């Protein structure tokens, strides 16, 4: 039973004792006592007017009683005025009985009760009546098992039986000592490593080549941490075959071929399986194109094409791939057929169903010609100066050169291809200018006759090396 009262008086102050909740003052004896009320089912508000001629003061009392199964709380307030009429108003509040809520799983009576009318309730003796924990409840905490809330120490020490059972199970599991599951092994694993405790195998039997577990010959796999039969185990390794196969499959995964355009090799198929062209980038100003395959088509007939070279070009050496001969012709005069410009090299050159694509990278709009290396690989170079704009005399001279399938046409070759009847292979002939002496044709390997003075072409040296690159500068 805890009770307290407050007294408001206009003339004298009110003194409050925290240890003893009974107020003391000049009007202490005039305070009405709190009357306990029976437990109603609702909130009861009672107001009464009392006539008083000489009453000046107000009282406020409240009482709260906590028991095992019920909660009683009453609030009494009395306000008096010093007027002549002497009206006195008194309020009495009684809280509804709080029903207990089950807090434990075993069905024991536990309750959580709330009384919103009383300002504060003391949980235990010796604590202040009014709690200082703002915003938090200072009552009915840690209630379990139907204990009396008046003793906070007893309430805090009691726990639910379900929690006790769980703690007991954990303690039993920790106290149980695990042993090795190999037959005949009674090694206590309580002080062993966590790995061996978890898999219930001692360190000696985890590495043994053969153990008996449940009457069967087994061996412990240190990779998958399981016992396997001897047939499933690799005797040379410490892992089972399935684990090893998965490991090898991950290590031997086929890796995709990396294609780089620096100074590496890019292999692409331009024809079929019998023809393959390897392209190298970054090794020359415009790259080198080398054909490694020779067509094996048997009888294509005489495939002829007409070449027309500009006047500043000089006869070049024959490119000697196997069964591949093509030469360029220095011919003055008008161009017989249309000239192929640098942007036409991106097209496809047909060779009886097989196509090859000549790559053009940064070719100078003026000209790009083909010069032969010692190994026969054509080299794309840039014309350093193209100063000739003079027109030569009209001349209708054509050069026919036999090209076998699989050869790569020079980039500035003018292809006006016509398929004729099969002819016997002959050496490539180059027509001379009509104005030069000695008329007729000259064979490969002979030095070409000099041109006349009007169209004398002087070869210039390439800045990169000391050999002539096959370009001419006209005077």
Swiss-Prot record:
Intrachain disulfide bonds: none
MF GO annotations: DNA binding; zinc ion binding
Cellular component GO terms held in the UniProt record: nucleus
Stretches with biased composition (Low complexity): 51-73
Binding site for Zn(2+) 2: 221, 224, 228, 240
Taxonomic superkingdom: Eukaryota
UniProt feature, compositional bias: Polar residues: 465-475
Residues covered by region (Disordered): 49-73, 437-475
Zn-finger (SBP-type) residues: 177-254
Localization, UniProt: Nucleus
Main location: nucleus
Induction remark: Negatively regulated by microRNAs miR156b and miR156h.
Positions annotated to bind Zn(2+) 1: 180, 185, 202, 205
Xref: Pfam families: SBP
Motif (Bipartite nuclear localization signal): 237-253
Known tissue expression: Expressed in young panicles.
Keywords linked to the UniProt accession: DNA-binding, Metal-binding, Nucleus, Transcription, Transcription regulation, Zinc, Zinc-finger
Entry function: Trans-acting factor that binds specifically to the consensus nucleotide sequence 5'-TNCGTACAA-3'. May be involved in panicle development.
Domain notes: The SBP-type zinc finger is required for the binding to DNA.
Protein name per Swiss-Prot or TrEMBL: Squamosa promoter-binding-like protein 12
